[in-house]
């Protein structure tokens, strides 16, 4: 048997973390939760000591030896820093790979996992900067979670929509409309050809538009547009609320109105609330759209925080059928390789490690349903060929200003997007190259769609060309 700390005896005092938590000879187990951290130690702190400190402070350690260590098997429960490597091209920057025993975590609780791994260690003085780049959830832990309420295939079956990405639109202005005018905007977009419309992240229940009024007028818009088009329509009714009890009351009312999908701001509301809502959605046959409001506060800086791929994986465990993922081509931050890496982590069942896409660990989801990525933020019809090529069919392409900003109004804006999408999907299915021929494909479609022609003319010069801050 390996010699444990208990067998070695107790000696009071402070000792280097690496004596206990740096274990370069350790081989991770299939049941271990693995984490990859990017870190920069303070001057004078060796990389192995800093890596060990991260393992200690995110698992069983504290700053001094304590006699109660003798009451348990520390070697069994401690986090183990099993590998450290320098970050290529960066001075005093390293990756630390840490293995955590499965027993450290409560089953089915993203809240507990994050509280353990990132809850305290990010304020540790010995570390100048720290970022959680990736997590490998072991299958044994994955199986304790419900995950998405329904998943991609069930959603397509419920909505009877196949063979193409789905189209959405965020209603603008995001704040200030009365409930009736809001419902009117929803109706115009849906009758024009969109599959979904959406509450913005900060629409909850404000004085100018109380939630119950909004739900009622939106329900009228959905039922009317469905009757006119013969297609199933949806609107992401934001049920995010000050309390979980109020959140569930709003969700129940949406269900009573026959709404197929609701929405939640999972970061600002918290993982406990989100998991509660996801389980309710599974039990009640309601789809769940997830907005990532506040994510850039956590994930945008490349040297400190949590990468969005970790947040996306945590959301898949907690539960959501849609998740905003960036666009690559729009107004919001998003490197292409990295974005496609975490999009696969959202949708696929098994993803191999691929550092070129930021995927540090092979992840097996054990048949857990996938999450539809939602491309949203500064996109318009000229982006359609690239979006179809990048995201494929299993996605939601969401045009807010790119629908409502059409010179002829909401319904023509929706029609322009639908025509552009159908043209790109047909061209792709015929074997045409969307990257090389995308402009020609759109112009050809615009010849028989005046709505698309007007949109192409309006936004032909609009681009968002800024350097991505978070590069691999």
UniProtKB/Swiss-Prot annotation:
The record marks 331 as: Transition state stabilizer. The active site is at 172 (proton acceptor), 291 (proton acceptor). Keywords: Bacterial microcompartment, Calvin cycle, Carbon dioxide fixation, Carboxysome, Disulfide bond, Lyase, Magnesium, Metal-binding, Monooxygenase, Oxidoreductase, Photorespiration, Photosynthesis. Mg(2+) binds at residues 198, 200-201. The modification N6-carboxylysine is found at residue 198. One of its GO terms (molecular function) is monooxygenase activity. Its main location: other. Substrate binds at residues 120, 170, 174, 292, 324, 376. Binding of RbcS probably induces a conformation change that displaces RbcX2 and triggers the final mature conformation. Belongs to the RuBisCO large chain family. Type I subfamily. RuBisCO folding and assembly commences when the nascent large subunit folds with the help of the chaperonin GroEL-GroES. Monomers require chaperone RbcX2 to assemble into RbcL8 octamers yielding RbcL8-(RbcX2)8. RbcX2 is displaced by RbcS; as RbcX2 is removed RbcS mediates the ordering of an internal RbcL loop (Thr-64-Leu-70) in a catalytically active conformation. This is Ribulose bisphosphate carboxylase large chain.
């Amino acid at each position: 048997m390996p010699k444990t700390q208990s067998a070695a005896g107790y000696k009071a005092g402070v000792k280097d973390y690496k004596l206990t938590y740096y274990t370069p000879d350790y081989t991770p187990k299939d049941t271990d939760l693995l984490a990859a951290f990017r870190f920069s130690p303070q001057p004078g702190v060796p990389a192995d000591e800093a890596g060990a400190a991260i393992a200690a402070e995110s698992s069983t350690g504290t700053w001094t030896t304590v006699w109660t260590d003798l009451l348990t098997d520390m070697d069994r429960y401690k986090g183990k820093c099993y590998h450290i490597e320098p970050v290529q091209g960066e001075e005093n920057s390293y990756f630390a790979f840490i293995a955590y025993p499965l027993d450290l975590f409560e089953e089915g609780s993203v809240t507990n996992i994050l509280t353990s791994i990132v809850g305290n260690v990010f304020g540790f003085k010995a570390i100048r900067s720290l970022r959680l780049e990736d997590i490998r959830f072991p299958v044994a832990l994955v199986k304790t979670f419900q995950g998405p309420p329904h998943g991609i295939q069930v959603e397509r079956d419920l909505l009877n929509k196949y063979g193409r990405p789905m189209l959405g639109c965020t209603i603008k202005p995001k704040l200030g409309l009365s409930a009736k005018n809001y419902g009117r905007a929803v109706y115009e977009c849906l009758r024009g050809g969109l599959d979904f419309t959406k509450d913005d992240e900060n629409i909850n229940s404000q004085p100018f538009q109380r939630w119950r009024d909004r739900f009622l007028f939106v329900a009228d818009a959905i039922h009317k547009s469905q009757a006119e088009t013969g297609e199933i329509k949806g609107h992401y009714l934001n049920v995010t609320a000050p309390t979980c009890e109020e959140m569930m009351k709003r969700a129940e009312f949406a269900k009573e109105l026959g709404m197929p999908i609701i929405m939640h701001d999972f970061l600002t509301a918290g993982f406990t609330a989100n998991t509660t809502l996801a389980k309710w959605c599974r039990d009640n046959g309601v789809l769940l759209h997830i907005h990532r409001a506040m994510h850039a506060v956590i994930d945008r800086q490349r040297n400190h925080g949590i990468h969005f791929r970790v947040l996306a994986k945590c959301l898949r465990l907690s539960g959501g059928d849609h998740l905003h993922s960036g666009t690559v081509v729009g107004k919001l931050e998003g490197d292409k390789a990295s974005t496609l890496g975490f999009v696969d982590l959202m949708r696929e069942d098994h993803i191999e490690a691929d550092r070129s896409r930021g995927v540090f660990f092979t992840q097996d989801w054990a048949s857990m349903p996938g999450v539809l990525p939602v491309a949203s933020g500064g996109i318009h019809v000229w982006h359609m060929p690239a979006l179809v090529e990048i995201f494929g069919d299993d996605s939601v392409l969401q045009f807010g200003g790119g629908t409502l900003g059409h010179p002829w109004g909401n319904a023509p804006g929706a029609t322009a997007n639908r025509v552009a999408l159908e043209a790109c999907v047909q061209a792709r299915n015929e074997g045409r190259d969307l990257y090389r021929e995308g402009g020609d494909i759109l112009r050809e479609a615009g010849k028989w769609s005046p709505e698309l022609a007007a949109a192409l003319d309006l936004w032909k010069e609009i681009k968002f060309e800024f350097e991505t801050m978070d590069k691999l």
